[in-house]
Structure formats: C-alpha cells, structure tokens
Amino acid sequence: MASLLHKFLENASGKKGQDLASTAYLAALDHLLHSFPSIGKSVIDELKGQRSRLKMIASENYASISVQLAMGNLLTDKYCEGSPFKRFYSCCENVDAIEWECAETAKELFGAESAFVQPHSGADANLLAMMAIITQKIQGPAVKRLGYKTINDLTDKEYAELKAEIGSHVCLGPSLNSGGHLTHGTVRMNVMSKLMRCLPYEVNKKTERFDYAEIARLVRTHKPTVLVAGYSSYSRRLNFSTLKQIADDCGAVLWVDMAHFAGLVAGGVFVEEENPIPFADIVTTTTHKTLRGPRGGLVLASKEYDGIINRACPLMMGGPLPHVIAAKAVALKEALTVDFKKYAHQVVDNARTLAEHFQKQGLRLLTGGTDNHMLIIDLTSLGISGRIAEDILSSIGIAVNRNTIPSDAVGKWDTSGIRLGTPALTTLGMGSDEMEEVANIIVKVLRNITLRRNADDSFSKSEGELPENIAQEARARVADLLSRFPLYPEIDLETLV
C-alpha cells in the first residue's frame, strides 16, 4: 500500500510552491502510522475531527505547523535543570541558545524586563508566581530577621513558625463564578488555596463587571499580600493602572494572569492601562490560547522577582521541556509579525460581531457584550443547562464549553451558561460574515433544544434533544463553513486513510 507521503507527493506533483513544512508534517504522520498504527490512527482521527467542527472553546486555538514541528525532535531527550548558562547538567549549550532566544523574544514581544519560559503550563506559571512572591515578601524577610543566610539554616521550630506565618497572609483574587481560574486561590481543592489565606472578590451583581471600588474596599479591609487580577471567563477588559494603585495603597503585590488575553496584548489590541506589563509586578500566561503556540506557560516579571523566578529549579520545578521551549520560541516570533497584529484585532472584531448577532436574536450575554475574545451566554431563559447546550452543539459540529455564571443556580457541573471564543475561527480566516452565520446556527439550535423525557414521564436535567431536521440543517451549514475555511489546507485529507 502506498504511504501517506507517497500519495501526498503524487497529488502535489507539478504544483508550484510545494510547502516543505506540510511535507515534513505528513512524513511524520506517515512514519507514526506505520510504526505504531493505533497511535498514528488516533492522531489522524483527531486531525479529521478538528477539521469537522467549529472550534469555539475560548481557550483553544490552532498552532502553526512550524510550531508543531519544532516540538517533534531530539530536544526532548535533553535534561537541562537550571537556567541558561547555569545548568545542573553538562552539554546544554544548544538548549541554552534556544531558551535564551525564546526569553529574549518574549521580552521583545511584551516589553517585559524579564521572561522565564520554562513553565510546562499556565498552572505551573501561576504556582511559580505565588512561590516567588512568598519567597520575596515573606520567607526572605523572615530569614533575615532571624539572622540567617538561607532557609536551610532555620531550626525545625522556626521553620514550622515560618510556614504558619505564610499561611496567615492573604491572597485576594477573582472567584470562579466571577470569571477567575482554579489557580487564583479561591478554590479550596486547588493547591494554591493551601499556600495562603485566599479570599475572593466578585463581580457586581447588576453589571456583572468587576467593581474597582469594591476591590479597593476589600483590599483596605483584608490587607492582602497578593492581589490577583485576570480571568478565564470574563468578557471585558481590565484597567491595570487602577488595580496597581489599589495594590500599592496597601503594599500588595499585583500579579496578573493574562493567559487568555496574552495574544491581544502581543498584538497591540490591549494597550495603555489595559496592558498589564507596565503595571504588574508579575505577569503569567499560557503560550497557547490567543498566542497560538504550544501548550506551556511564561512568567514575565519585574527585576525584583527575576532572580527568584530564574531559580524555579529547585523552588518548584525540575527539568524543563526544551522541545516545547523551541516551539514557544517559534510561536513568539510569529507573534512579532504584522500578520499576527491583524489577527489579534480581528479576533476581537469577530467576538463583538458574534455578540451583536446573539443579542439581536434575544440571547442574554453576561456583562451585556464583549471587549475581548470571548462571550458567555446565560441560558437560564431557555430552560436548559450549559451541559445540555454543550452536548447538543457538539453533536452538530460546534465545540463550546459549559460555564458557570455569577450566582449560578444550576451548579458547577451542569452550569447555567456556555462560553464561546473566536481565536480559532479567526485563525481559519473567518470574518464578520461568517460570525453572523455561526450566530444564526447556534441560536436556532439553542432555541429548539428540549429536555429529554425520562421513563417516569419526568424531564431530564442533564440530557436534551434536538429535532433531526434542525440537526441536519445545522450540520450542513457547519460543513459548508468548514469547507470554505479548512484547517491546515496544505494537508490533503484524502491521503489520510
């Protein structure tokens, strides 16, 4: 049987400008499929799956083939604990060069004083930020006060007292229902809540937006050591100048998690007081989402925290992933281009267009709209849960995720809302006309979902139904959009058998 690569090259024969990256990508799939068929098949099936649905999960995107190829090489074999030119292992010169270039690119892209590119994820980056703050603001002064040079010099009793002192300090962050993230400290099941006394701030019940006066009041009351700002499900921008002033008034560290909107900062959409870099003491982010890179994290910090963060090993990390760091470097370089800036602005334009068409058709959006890349639909008036909407939309080829809303009466599993984002559809090249069509498809589906009737004649709270004629129409409309805006068009799916 002819290989995938042979079929691809036969089909491409005579075509001008044959893309080297797509050839290399297909060659890798070809090898994997023949050497480890079950794994290769699953990878190809995922590619087919992603090409057959509209990806509207706000935290997902599509990395370029160049980014993906940068991860698939022998860099994965190298141990390199430490930081560039200060490793705990020998023969790290090439990894040093890659990590140094990646960090310098991050500093250039964001205008940051320092950049640490090793975190494996946004959660790792957030944990490192918290540990760096604890080390700088609590542990360091305590060790100095006791007359020691390092924490290892403390007696067992003194160390126990220090841990108790750390636990008494307050971290103030956005609650989960108000759009915060698990790693912002307000979810007790998460390790972050176990490091300090973590307290939440909420959005205003009427406006569903963060109330800076209320945050300032809470800061004056609780005198936190750390003020966390950022979000995973909030459709407006933040004023980091105001948040910095609030933090400074009580001597708190301002830590911003910009995982969701880093690409909008890099692309010049969020500027001045909406850009956290000039104001925050520490900024964390993922490298996927709006940055379109590999799954990973970054920490951007002021000089005060640079030394501590670059000692992430042994603070809370072991060996980094040099192959992923190489992919981060590629993605960050892509984000320096003019095309990326155009992309970032289009992401927000598309989100606003989507929101406008939802509202015209009577759907309620949290905060009344969007200023960024996402929007949250309140499904309460439709009588269905976020879980049901997520499942039904998935069945017709649209990927969204269920999401809690403030004062959610349904609960954190089923939820009363769904979150939608435009980063991935914008990467495919879709614009305002396509957003109108997407909105029309979603509204028609949501308005025709009914609750499934149980055997006892009651209605299910977790399962819904969609009339087959509506489902077929929606699938056809989704397929039409995807046929005009295919994922990785340079990869011919006809060869992927």
From Swiss-Prot:
Main location, first listed in the record: cytoplasm
Function: Catalyzes the reversible interconversion of serine and glycine with tetrahydrofolate (THF) serving as the one-carbon carrier. This reaction serves as the major source of one-carbon groups required for the biosynthesis of purines, thymidylate, methionine, and other important biomolecules. Also exhibits THF-independent aldolase activity toward beta-hydroxyamino acids, producing glycine and aldehydes, via a retro-aldol mechanism.
Binding site for (6S)-5,6,7,8-tetrahydrofolate: 176, 180-182
CDD domains, A to Z: SHMT
HAMAP family: SHMT (MF_00051)
PANTHER family, per the entry: SERINE HYDROXYMETHYLTRANSFERASE, SERINE HYDROXYMETHYLTRANSFERASE 1
GO cellular component entries: cytosol
Top-level taxon: Bacteria
Site positions per UniProt: Plays an important role in substrate specificity: 288
Cofactor requirement: pyridoxal 5'-phosphate
Subunit annotation: Homodimer.
PROSITE patterns reported for this sequence: SHMT
Metabolic or biological pathway, per its Swiss-Prot or TrEMBL entry: One-carbon metabolism; tetrahydrofolate interconversion; Amino-acid biosynthesis; glycine biosynthesis; glycine from L-serine: step 1/1
MF terms (GO), sorted A to Z: glycine hydroxymethyltransferase activity; pyridoxal phosphate binding
UniProt EC number: 2.1.2.1
Taxonomic source organism: Chlamydia caviae (strain ATCC VR-813 / DSM 19441 / 03DC25 / GPIC) (Chlamydophila caviae)
Protein name (database record): Serine hydroxymethyltransferase
Modified residues (N6-(pyridoxal phosphate)lysine): 289
Transmembrane helix found in the keyword field: no
